[in-house]
């Protein structure tokens, strides 16, 4: 009888050990998965442009040689597209600053500067448009950007979507980068015909061969 009881106790102990061994890899896998997920989330957070408080935005604006037509702008905290200034850090010494200027009827204007730690330099941007009777787009360099802007911190780029009318079925969109602090056009799309098609989808518009 004692022999049978001893065998039963040994069997129960072996069964408990096996179940614990089976759970251990699952727990380790869960920990590894959680760690990997945290790394991905951290990477995504690091890709986002620097978020500035309203006070920080005003501090940046005071560093810029803004003209009188660009009044002091108080952003609406509830509107992510409302801002006084945004920054894109290119490196330890250079920062691109996007300052909201005039509001406009359906899209605002922006002045963009390169800050080197001591002074701000106004930047100009190549824009391509078709001017009748010409049928091919021609380039002009503008210092004031009308439209919606967005920084891509991971790619160190500025994205612009400029509408010719409120419907957004015509206009242009561009992606700019800043190698060595110089403005470069990486991508440009233009749609001159306001025909109601492809509204708010500038990525579907004809691409322009940039110079």
Predicted regions: what they are:
Residues 11-13:
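C-terminal motif of bacterial Sec signal peptides marking the signal peptidase cleavage site
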């Amino acid at each position: 009888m004692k022999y049978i009881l001893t065998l039963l106790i040994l069997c129960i102990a072996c069964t408990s050990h096996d179940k614990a061994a089976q759970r251990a890899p699952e727990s380790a896998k869960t920990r590894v998965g959680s760690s990997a997920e945290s790394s991905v989330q951290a990477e995504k957070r690091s890709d986002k442009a620097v978020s500035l408080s309203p006070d920080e935005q005003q501090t940046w604006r005071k560093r810029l040689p803004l003209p009188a037509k660009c009044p002091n702008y108080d952003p609406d905290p509830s509107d992510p597209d409302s801002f006084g200034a945004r920054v894109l850090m290119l490196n330890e010494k250079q920062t691109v600053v996007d300052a909201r200027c005039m509001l406009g009827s359906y899209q605002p204007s922006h002045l963009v500067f390169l800050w080197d730690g001591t002074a701000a330099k106004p930047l100009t941007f190549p824009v391509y448009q078709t001017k009748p009777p010409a049928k091919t787009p021609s380039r002009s360099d503008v210092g004031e950007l009308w439209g919606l802007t967005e920084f891509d911190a991971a790619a160190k780029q500025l994205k612009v979507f400029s509408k010719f009318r409120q419907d957004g079925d015509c206009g242009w969109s561009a992606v700019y980068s800043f190698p060595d602090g110089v403005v470069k056009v990486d991508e440009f799309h233009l749609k001159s015909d306001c025909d109601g098609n492809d509204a708010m989808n500038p990525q579907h518009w004809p691409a322009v061969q940039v110079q």
